[in-house]
Each structure stands twice: as C-alpha cells, then as structure tokens.
Amino acid sequence: MELPIYYCKTWFRMKKFAIEPMDESLAHSRHLSGESYTALIGSDSAPSCFVEFSIDKGMVGVGFLDKKCREYLTYQFQVTDSDNLFLTMATHREFEGDGDEVIGGESYIFNEEGGLVIRREKFNPHEVEEARSSFEPSRNYEKLPKFGCYSNLTKADR
C-alpha cells in the first residue's frame, strides 16, 4: 500500500513541523524546475520520513522519523549527473530515553571510489572513534526519482 505524500518547503527538525505546506502542483513544478521542496511520507504532521530535494545545490536528503518525530536516521545523496544520485553519508542517532537529546551516533561516509569512513561519536563524555574501510560503491547509486516516486530513496535498510 502506498503511503500518502504531502509537500512543504522544508521539515523543521527541532520543532517537528512542516514549514510552508504546498499543494502537489506547486511541488511538481518545483521538482521539474530543480527548485527545493520536501516530500513528507505518510502524514503532514507526523511523517515516517521526509525527502528534501535541493537539486539546485546538488543534493537530496532523506530523514527517517520515529514515533516521537525524532530523526533517527539520515541519508545524504549527492547528484552525480542529470539522472543519478550517490549515497555519500548515512547517519544513525541514539537518543536519551524519550527525550530529544542526541547522546551518540554513527556516520558512514562513502565515496564513489569505494572508500568508507565510519565515525562513532558519544557526547557525554565526548568520545569519537573513526575507522576506514572499503565497500562496493555500485549499491549506493540510485536514479533521481520521478515526482511522487520516492520509495527507492526511502528504504531504511540499505
């Protein structure tokens, strides 16, 4: 079953609401012209995830939200050409209990040549671990989606 999609200028992460909601026709126009917009998946007030299109800046971001609308997982895609995206970073956050305070997380930073940096960070006390590795980059490519067809970008398990 396809989830409903709502559109806005951006999702305000700190206050957990949509800024400047827009109708589908305006969002479609912005998609075609490469202007920024955000697609909210599942709900306009408590989406399961959102997709931020900033093609004019060469990026697409995906934020996955838990039941408390906290962004626990983020994907950052870079536009590689007119049809393709490359996943350059995935960040997983851990929260303090039911609150919004981030207590730690892991970031995976990928490059198109197969290089990988894994960064684990805790905030109290502050600790950072970093490791380097390699990976098969072909799995990080995605087609730039057509308007309204975001399911390839919103796969939480990559």
Language-model regions, residue ranges each:
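Generic detector of short, locally flexible boundary/turn motifs and exposed helical patches
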Residues: 3, 14-18, 39-42, 82-84
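Short, well-structured hydrophobic secondary-structure segments
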Residues: 35-67
